[in-house]
Structures are given as C-alpha cells and as structure tokens.
Amino acid sequence: MKEATDVFNHWAHLGKDEGMERGHANAVNEMIDVAMERVLEGRVAFSAVDLGCGNGWVVRKLSQHPACVEAVGYDGAEHMIEKAKEGDFINTYHCAKFPETKPEKTYQFVHSMEFLYYLKDPKGMLQSIHDDWLEEGGWAVIGIDHYAEHEESLSWPEALEVHMSTFSEAEWIQMWNDVGFQEIHAWRANARDGKPGTLAILGKKA
C-alpha cells in the first residue's frame, strides 16, 4: 500500500488539487456555513485551523471571513504545502505528520475535509483534535466521503492502493461521543442527484 502523503504529493504535481477543490467546494461551503452559526454564537471573532489543508483553499476561504482573525493550515504532503505557500503570502502553513504533530496553540474552529480516514487510528486523531487543537468552547467540523453507506467509496482503497479506515455513519458519530465532543450534529452535506453526499459531523469542546 502507498502512503497517502505520497499520493497527494503526486496529485499536487499533476494539478489534481484544483479538481479536488472544485469537487469538494459545495460540501465544504455547506459545512462551514452550518459551523459558523455555532462558532459565532456569543463570539465576535475566531481563529481557525484546517487539518489536511491541501493547497490551502479552505484556509484562504476562512481567512476572508470578516470575523476570522487567524487561519492556519497543516498537511502531510510537502508539495501541497509548497503550493499553498506559493498561492498565499498572508496565512500560515505547516507540513506535519499526523497524529504526532501537536499545535503550539489552540483554535476556536477546526475544519477538516477528506483527511481523517486516511489515518490508521482516526479515533486517536479525533481525540487529539478535541484535547490538543480546540480551545474550550470551540467547534470542529469534519467531512468524510469514504464511509460504509457510501457504497461507491468502498472501492477506493483498492483502486488507489492506499489505506482507508472504513466505518459506518453510526460508528463515526460514536467516536465523537467517545472522545468527549458535545452538541454533536451529523448530516450529509451536498447530497443530491442520487449521490449520498459527504458525511459531515460537527461538535463542540465544552
């Protein structure tokens, strides 16, 4: 099996990151809109981090929000981080190894799209997001396209020769409960035209 970071490094060279951005935009926009209703409740400003940020497109989007005071991106693929830095001189990007990497500070909003299931221990990373990355009272939203109910996605690990951790919607939601998240809300973002959509899960560190 290939390392996921090697696959994404290759895709960055091929320019596939731009296609990923277009393909994920509708789901991500919906996820952020839903999350912001909670993040900005009783708060006039927020800091944000995108884990598995790729070429930085979500970081750039978040930084343009009028209430965002800081937006940071982390990714394990070196060439993705290079592309992010080349296209953005304002925000900060880090090449990181997960789940080992821990932040120097906590954030009020954590976003992640198509990242968690590439890890062999996604629950451990989710625990770290809750314990290490989020400020108390902060919110996390995570998008997952590879899950048991999305039957088309079940062939992806073999097709890409990359490890993917496969769980059902209920199992993913239970992980959020297990690691301590509260006010958990799960839905399928951008579900249309007979497609199951992105499993989006939102939760708060209380």
Q: What does each model-identified segment do?
A:
Residues H111:
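A conserved beta-strand element that flanks and buttresses the S-adenosyl-L-methionine
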Residues D145-H163:
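Short, glycine-/aromatic-enriched active-site segment of Class I SAM-dependent methyltransferases
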Residues M164-V179:
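Short alpha-helix
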Residues R188-A206:
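Core SAM-dependent methyltransferase catalytic element
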Residues M1-L40, A148-E149:
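Conserved class I S-adenosyl-L-methionine
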Residues G137-D145:
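Conserved beta-strand signature within the Rossmann-like core of class I S-adenosyl-L-methionine
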Residues K123-E136:
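A short glycine-rich, Lys/Arg-flanked "PGG" loop and its adjoining helix->strand segment in the class I
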Residues V49-L51, N55-E100:
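Class I SAM-dependent methyltransferase SAM/SAH-binding core
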